[in-house]
Each structure stands twice: as C-alpha cells, then as structure tokens.
A protein has these predicted regions:
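Conserved alpha/beta core of the MobA/IspD/sugar-nucleotide pyrophosphorylase nucleotidyltransferase superfamily
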Residues: 117-184
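A recurrent flexible, glycine/aromatic-enriched loop bordering the glycosyltransferase active site
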Residues: 109-119
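A structural signal for isolated positions on well-ordered beta-strands in alpha/beta enzyme cores
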Residues: 8-10, 35, 159
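Acidic helix N-cap motif at the loop->helix transition within catalytic regions
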Residues: 19-24
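Conserved beta-loop-beta/alpha segment of the NTase-like Rossmann-fold superfamily
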Residues: 43-106, 120
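Short, small-residue-biased leader/transition segments that mark boundaries at the very start
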Residues: 1-6
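Conserved donor nucleotide-binding strand/loop of the catalytic core
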Residues: 29-41
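Short internal beta-strands
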Residues: 9-14, 92
C-alpha cells in the first residue's frame, strides 16, 4: 500500500510556556518540522489553533494527547490508513466492564458493554472535514471532549482502530507509577 508520511508536527502549549517549549524543542535534533502554537482555554481551542497552523495542502490531521506517551508507530499508521475510506479514524479499546448510567446516586440502567469502546488518541481526520466540524461546533456552542464527537454532529463516518492498554493517559499518581514501570 501507499506509505503515508507526516510532514509537520504541531504542539499546542499554554501561552505562558511558548518560549520555554520552543527553546526545549529547539535543542532536540529532529528531521521533521515542529511548529509550536499557543493553545487555548479548552481542548477545542487548542485543536483549532493547531489545525489552522497546518498547511492548507495537508490532507489529514492526526491529533494526539501528549498525556499518552506510549503510542506505537503501528497504531499511528493504522489510524492514517483507516482514513483512506472514511472521514476519520479514532483509536479505541473495547470495554470489558459492566457500564451503568446513574442519576442522583442510583442506577438508572445498564448499557450493553459490547457497544462501548473507550476512545484514545490519535484521532485522525481529513483536514477540511475537521475544520467544518470545528466551525459547526463554534457556531452552535457545542462543547466536546474529543474531536470525534464534533465529527459525529455532522454525521461523518469515523472508523475505529483497535488500540492497546499501554496507550493509556497519564492523569493520576497511579498512572505515573504505571508509566514509570513501563519505562524502566
């Protein structure tokens, strides 16, 4: 199959960290162009700023959480390739737990766990379609926790690429401990 390549990397950082991150990245030898952009008050704003900083000639945009440092090259390639016949692709892992919706401390109902997947990143989309979704979300005050959610509002077809448990998000002390065990 055709080999897809990543031309540019964009890192969104808080405004007050721009200079530090530019210095840090500048000290690393890399073969790709790395753009450092100011993020925003929300993930949506950071993604918008990042996407707008990419070349208009870019076909695909691959969004990845820096809090998921154990992403594999293979998962990135699978995500990019899944976009060939879809509007986008997300990495997700199947859920094996029983899921309940609860209201005011009481179980309301059980959701079929076979229908529940836990989204990870990367999430890859055609740049033009993602910009449509960002525009729609802004105009309609839609707040989302990931880009796939924005795409869903416009009925774009998003493929699921099976991820793996090591592509976890580091957000708690337990996650840090798990991460340090993987690095050692």
């Amino acid at each position: 199959g055709s080999e897809m390549c990543i031309r540019d990397s964009v890192i969104a950082v808080p405004e007050h960290r721009l200079a530090d991150v530019k210095t840090e990245i500048g000290s690393i030898k890399v073969s790709k162009n790395i753009l450092i952009v100011s993020g925003g008050p929300s993930r949506q704003e950071s993604v918008k700023n990042s996407v707008l900083s990419t070349s208009q000639n870019a076909d695909l945009v691959c969004i990845h959480d820096s809090a998921r440092p154990f992403i594999s090259e293979n998962l990135i390639k699978k995500s990019l390739n899944a976009c060939a016949s879809n509007d986008g692709a997300i990495v997700a892992i199947p859920n094996y737990d029983t899921i309940k919706t609860c209201v005011r401390g009481y179980v309301e109902k059980t959701i079929d766990r076979n229908d529940v997947w836990m989204a990870q990143t990367p999430q890859v989309f055609w740049r033009s379609k993602l910009l449509q979704a960002i525009d729609f979300s802004e105009k309609n005050n839609v707040e989302v926790t990931d880009e796939s959610s924005m795409m869903e509002y416009l009925d774009f077809q998003i493929s699921v690429v099976k991820g793996n448990a090591n592509n976890f998000k580091i957000t708690s002390p337990e996650d840090w401990e798990r991460a340090s065990n993987l690095v050692i």
